[in-house]
Amino acid sequence: MSTTTTDQGIKNVVLVHGAFADGSGWRGVYDNLTARGYRVTIVQNPLTSFEDDVAATTRVLDRQDGPTILVGHSWGGTVITEAGNHENVAGLVYVSALE
């Protein structure tokens, strides 16, 4: 397996969970990425509406200190498609996601 050290590029990763779940489902990914030196944030979406989930994700993106990879699982894919227009977003990753 090839790994990239964080001094070669983007250091921030934001993880967005799907519906009928919460951010705890990302714990293994969080542990793996932080062990490799990435700064990882897990969004805790309220799942009250699409707009509320996008707003929660945008608030997390506002706090990032540079280019960020935004990752969405399932319903989180729909959320990151909208939030992906944020100036800090360098790329989107869809994991079994809806667009």
Language-model segments: which ranges?
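Conserved hydrolase catalytic core segment
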Residues: 66-99
